[in-house]
Amino acid sequence: MKNWDGYFMNIARMVAESNTSCIRRQFGALLVRNDKSIISTGYNGAPSGVKSCGERGFCYRDVNKIESGTRHEACYAVHAEQNALIFAAKHGTPTKGAVCYVTAKPCSVCLRLLVQAGIAEIIYDKDYPEAWEGYEDIAAIIKMRKYDQK
């Protein structure tokens, strides 16, 4: 039996590794239908047409000593999950009932967007430093689990 979780998580990792626009972190996300077909991929980076941190040679968050998992508005990068949802929407591809494979646990902003987009399950590879206080109700309505490599 094929290990679909491993297969799709490896693709999400490859998407993250191909990201050269963010100096600080590389995240990848993948949206997958129930029939195991890939809807879209996304990685964290600057919006289209905007110079990335890699191109500028510095990270605004690093320069201003902003901790990971805090003050998301201090960076204009689009998160991997957000990009995956945006690319699906741009191409008119429904996401309701899909699974999101992502290389790190979604931040609270991405969690809300994934719930609103009808994602049925989130499978993440690593923990993310953001505290989720107050988001228990939102997290309770979407299936979420950490990827198990066993």
For the regions a language model picked out, list residue spans one by one.
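Zinc-dependent deaminase catalytic domain
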Residues: M1-K150
